[in-house]
Amino acid sequence: MTQDKILILDFGSQVTQLIARRVREAHVYCELHSFDMPLDEIKAFNPKGIILSGGPNSVYESDYQADTGIFDLGIPILGICYGMQFMAHHLGGEVQPGNQREFGYAQVKTIDSELTRGIQDDTPNTLDVWMSHGDKVSKLPTGFTVIGDTPSCPIAMMENAEKQFYGIQFHPEVTHTKQGRALLNRFVLDICGAQPSWTMPNYIEEAVAKIREQVGSDEVILGLSGGVDSSVAAALIHRAIGDQLTCVFVDHGLLRLNEGKMVMDMFARNLGVKVIHVDAEGQFMEKLAGVTDPEKKRKIIGAEFIEVFDAEEKKLTNAKWLAQGTIYPDVIESAGAKTKKAHAIKSHHNVGGLPENMKLKLLEPLRDLFKDEVRELGVALGLPREMVYRHPFPGPGLGVRILGEVKKEYADLLRQADDIFIQELRNTTDENGTSWYDLTSQAFAVFLPVKSVGVMGDGRTYDYVVALRAVITSDFMTAHWAELPYSLLGRVSNRIINEVKGINRVVYDVSGKPPATIEWE
């Protein structure tokens, strides 16, 4: 099935990925590429329309220019913030620095136009939007009309109805812009005429066919971590090629309570996937002995994982492919790191990449999907919702939730405490019936290698401390500590102290990000 596609050219905005997510939510396939994508590649991509993202630069900086041949392709184009300024500048208009930066909430007064027709909510001819700009369009290009303004931005929206070119100075992709989703849907579905055929059933059908064509009769090996991405990748590949897939599950002794059993039950017993379970706890603990520096711990765990995985791979002499759970944000960030044009690049945990001596081809069946789409796919493939919608878990596991040196004793205590915390979050709901686990974005316990005095019964105790951490965030770049009910925190504390022998004090972390990070190490 041929998908209609939207192309997003990225000029470096912090929220460009949100544009892609909004388009995908309209069930239209889109891809995000660097602003300097060559024109012949754009033509080959054959988009139904193009969206030009925002960005931190000025249109007068020669390093941030797209090929102006896009304006001769005869397809609709929407410019957002910097994208609008780029459009105006190159089509004969003028852009000048604003007398004052406009940042935050604004109301745009609109007139009837192709772009705004039917998207206002309660107040006719008004859009509630989120602005973030300094420069602004001061003179329209020929053929354009103003379709929206604010007191400080007389040309907040513009259109050339004949050519279907549109410019908006605000960000429709962020949730603060009340009618933003409707505006993007109007552009993508109505103006571009893209068909909403990007659905999980369609994706599964296409992905299965693609994997079969790519792999043929070859065997595939996949490192199964128990995390969402590798689990969904395993389920999808197994749907496509069955016993040609072998998963390697490395238990380094730093997993959550009963996680190894859960993974084996789900994949080996329920789905019939071939899984090699490697118990490497002793090996990892030996390497981590005496190491207290967080970065050194991460590197040791990563290197040891590759070594264990590599040893298992060598036993599977018929394997020709290495499968990974790479997802679309990983692809975008890696591309940004290579071009040096992205403004915020983070590293991500995969199987550490391909070791140099590994002569395997790479299979990445999730590389076109955002995280929310991966979760949706997992449910569609029959994985339990509880597994698919679990909170993020760091690649090094409990190794970075035990402060200082990692010991088996510490990991065993932390596992039990963390499990109690998660149980209570799942079992406690707010007034709307939503569990506090679903209300929080990430929650976990942290082991502190310090002892404090306590009293239990008639005796004095001198045991360890755990800290509870729960945050609410939309993007994990910033986060607010979750204001959990005192009754919930009290229950968690009582259960941990009574049920986990060796812990006598529980504290709750009320630090936001920034200044603190979400993980303690």
UniProtKB/Swiss-Prot annotation:
Gene3D superfamilies: 3.30.300.10, 3.40.50.880, HUPs. The gene is guaA. ATP binds at residues 225-231. Its EC number is 6.3.5.2. Homodimer. It is an enzyme of class 6 (ligase). It comes from the Bacteria. Pathway: Purine metabolism; GMP biosynthesis; GMP from XMP (L-Gln route): step 1/1. Residues 198-390 form the GMPS ATP-PPase domain. This is GMP synthase [glutamine-hydrolyzing]. PANTHER family: GMP SYNTHASE [GLUTAMINE-HYDROLYZING], GMP SYNTHASE-RELATED. InterPro entries: Class_I_gatase-like (IPR029062), GATASE (IPR017926), GMP_synth_C (IPR001674), GMP_synth_GATase (IPR004739), GMP_synthase (IPR022955), GMPS_ATP_PPase_dom (IPR025777), NAD/GMP_synthase (IPR022310), Rossmann-like_a/b/a_fold (IPR014729). It comes from Neisseria meningitidis serogroup C / serotype 2a (strain ATCC 700532 / DSM 15464 / FAM18). The active site is at 81 (nucleophile), 171, 173. NCBIfam families: guaA_Cterm, guaA_Nterm, PRK00074.1. Pfam families: GATase, GMP_synt_C, NAD_synthase.
